[in-house]
Amino acid sequence: MLDSSLAQEIAAIDGVELDSKVTFADLTTLRIGGKPRSAVRCQTTEALVSAIKLLDDASLPLLIVGGGSNLVVADGDLDVIAVIIETDDVSINLTDGLLTADAGAVWDDVVHLSVDAGLGGIECLSGIPGSAGATPVQNVGAYGTEVSDVLTRVQLLDRTTHQVSWVDASELDLSYRYSNLKFTNRAVVLAIELQLLTDGLSAPLRFGELGRRLAISEAEPHPRRPVRMVRDAVLELRRAKGMVVEHTDHDTWSAGSFFTNPIVDPALADAVFEKVGEPTMPRFPAGDGKEKLSAAWLIERAGFKKGHPGAGAKASLSTKHTLALTNRGDARASDLVALAKEIRDGVLETFGVTLVPEPVWIGISIDD
């Protein structure tokens, strides 16, 4: 619990609510995790800034939580204050295509609003769980689109000075599933600004699974489709893989894609190809002379099938998609760690490729 005087001071902030009952299992899409010392719910940006400043001044350990879709949290009582971002304003300028979203806005709601407004650029990111503020931190991406493609700037709270400022996207070192905000607590994302297209069409699409669904030909140089058509197709694909959160479907009790697609030297990619001998092995240029392989493909070829290790397991691969590690109803963090370690080590032993987990680990790690 918070010191009584500090608790009173924080509770007096307009737009703040103290919550002594919530657990991280309540706050994460994996539905795993123990209880924080206390939780502070912030409904406005001003409340969020004020609450964090008071807690930082008291030198208390904080965990900033948005949609909870990218967190693996340890079981038991945790010595941390959960600061829950519940800001949700979204504004759209239809003339210039600028969209601004509070950090706590549900990401898929942001995408839905952009599509309803006829704006293109993030329709391929439909159905991704979590909040808007998390998208630049890990440079969220899917189906050939990344947030970095449209991100212009982010509003940050500097936790050293507690000053608020807008920072250009070029200062975030954005790359595949990475920004310089990812592994640091120095700043909190308060809002994001996106530059979207205003002609009602999607960003250029690449040929592949989504392209086939949209009847795109490999001969089309820069294929585009109406944004609503693309969103609908993406949601169909994600639902078929259990990658759209449904409270009654344990295949969606996950952190989404658990491992990033590995970026490797061409020699290692060649070695994997020679070992498996499949002409259709997915491999893509990744810049700087590297290649990107499919983590899901590697997991399957290493012998891990959908639903592994089978019925009765507390944590298993999704029955719809091998890249999602799921809670089958009453899994603990230790169950998920054991499964993640088994998958990672199995792929390494089979192919010499090390899979890197995408979620942020709190109080536990894959090496525990």
Swiss-Prot record:
Its EC number is 1.3.1.98. Pathway: Cell wall biogenesis; peptidoglycan biosynthesis. It is an enzyme of class 1 (oxidoreductase). InterPro entries: FAD-bd_PCMH, FAD-bd_PCMH-like_sf, FAD-bd_PCMH_sub1, FAD-bd_PCMH_sub2, MurB, MurB_C, MurB_C_sf, Oxid_FAD_bind_N. Residues 32-199 form the FAD-binding PCMH-type domain. GO terms for biological process: cell division; cell wall organization; peptidoglycan biosynthetic process; regulation of cell shape. Keywords: Cell cycle, Cell division, Cell shape, Cell wall biogenesis/degradation, Cytoplasm, FAD, Flavoprotein, NADP, Oxidoreductase, Peptidoglycan synthesis. This is UDP-N-acetylenolpyruvoylglucosamine reductase. It comes from Corynebacterium glutamicum (strain R).
